[in-house]
Amino acid sequence: MRLSEFYSPTVKNVSSDVVSASHKYSIRAGIVSQTASGIYTLLPLGLMVLRKVENIIREEINAVGFSEILMPTMQPADLWKESQRYDSYGQELIRIHDRGGREMVLGPTHEEVVTDLVRSSLKSYRDLPVNLYQIQWKFRDELRPRNGILRSREFLMMDAYSFDTDFEKAMKTYDAVFRAYRKAFKRMNLQTIALKADMGAIGGSVSHEFHVLTPTGESTVYYDERALELSEMNDYGIEELKEVYAATDDMHDEKSCGIAPEDLKTARGIEVGHIFYLDDRYSRTMNVKFCNTDGHSGTHVKMGCYGIGISRLIGALIEVFHDDAGIKWPLSVAPFKVGIVNLFSKNEECKRVSERIHSVLPNDSLYDDRDDTPGVKLSRMDLIGLPWQVIVGNSFIKDGVLELKNRATGDIELLSVDDVVSRISV
């Protein structure tokens, strides 16, 4: 992609009320543009990152046996009244009326809709398990939206729902999703810590949150050192988690945690995922039953629900991967693999070499062919944060070599054109 043909409005300065790094760089690098308080337009670079995050999550959730659906954003208020959440959910729930006066809500979550969907076809234990997920926009009327896409009023979420015959099977599903989350976050180079969490407005009896630890996180988390060691393992489940202490602020109890004060760690974290075992919280209030192996038809299905904030993850990634110059995207989620910076756009030989490099990865490289000063071009590419930069500049004019810069480390290698082509083609 040529930068001259690509909509990428970078911004030099942001408002003084923009505090977090993710908010600042998401605006400055042209990832998002603010439409209103807590409402953002995803720009081309941001949408490319979003799609990569989305696909990683989709692949891992598919791998544990979930089927993708797409439920409506607008939901009948009657379903929320049936589940007894319409009044208790609070002012975050956006309530509207259609032209016929029927009460509707804009979905902040979809437990009611998916439960209604499954009960329409569920008859026997033979119809279970049912594992469904969607990737859909959610709406919450946040009182104080802040930190850009980390806490906005409209956000993209993967929400999954499981329906099982009994507790044991439901917890196997819960554990499978727990492991899928771990794999998805690792693929994004994010180290997450799993914490015992409050059930909140969703309800249920077991809950875990996944947090990325960063000094600028919104939440306080408590854990012992073994929880961090566990988070570095390639694979672990909820059974292993029982052996360590890790809790959100809402669930932490210093007296009963069993950890000596000198061994208890505290940190700030950004919540990026949440899973719940719901038991029969919704199947009982919405009367979702099935006929079991004994022929008894009064058994309530056991449910779980699982959420990952996809657009929120973009903010979390920027919080973790940035420096004073801008963003440093991990390769797995970067909008492009390589940025090509031609510092002398009017030099025919520099132009020819830049075109050759671009032809190697036409869909995975961003070629800065604009007629700007070298300083502007280099600063812009650092701000955007692509994993690799190929710089066609003085080194090429003098010695015929290119600069290959690793954005994450800042290391620069001087390589021949052929060697650069070989390196970026891998």
From Swiss-Prot:
Query: Protein name, please?
Result: Proline--tRNA ligase
Q: Which Gene3D superfamilies does its entry note?
A: Anticodon-binding domain, Bira Bifunctional Protein, Domain 2
Q: How does it assemble?
A: Homodimer.
User: Which reaction(s) does the protein catalyse, per the Swiss-Prot or TrEMBL entry?
Assistant: tRNA(Pro) + L-proline + ATP = L-prolyl-tRNA(Pro) + AMP + diphosphate
Which gene holds the coding sequence for this protein?
proS
The yes or no answer to whether the keyword Cytoplasm is present is yes
Instruction: Alphabetically list the UniProt keywords.
Output: Aminoacyl-tRNA synthetase, ATP-binding, Cytoplasm, Ligase, Nucleotide-binding, Protein biosynthesis
Gene Ontology BP annotations = prolyl-tRNA aminoacylation
Classification via Pfam families:
HGTP_anticodon, tRNA-synt_2b
Example GO molecular function: proline-tRNA ligase activity
List the subcellular locations: Cytoplasm
Top-level enzyme category: ligase
Q: Which family does it belong to?
A: Belongs to the class-II aminoacyl-tRNA synthetase family. ProS type 2 subfamily.
Q: Is Transcription included in the keywords of this UniProt record? A: no
Primary role: Catalyzes the attachment of proline to tRNA(Pro) in a two-step reaction: proline is first activated by ATP to form Pro-AMP and then transferred to the acceptor end of tRNA(Pro).
Kindly give the PANTHER family that the UniProt entry links to this protein: MITOCHONDRIAL RIBOSOME PROTEIN L39/PROLYL-TRNA LIGASE FAMILY MEMBER, PROLINE--TRNA LIGASE
Q: Between which residues do disulfide bridges form? A: none
Q: What InterPro entries would the database entry show?
A: aa-tRNA-synt_IIb, aa-tRNA-synth_II, aa-tRNA-synth_II/BPL/LPL, Anticodon-bd, Anticodon-bd_dom_sf, Pro-tRNA-ligase_IIa, Pro-tRNA-synth_IIa_bac-type, Pro-tRNA_synthetase
Gene Ontology CC: one annotated term: cytosol
| EC number annotated for this UniProt entry | 6.1.1.15
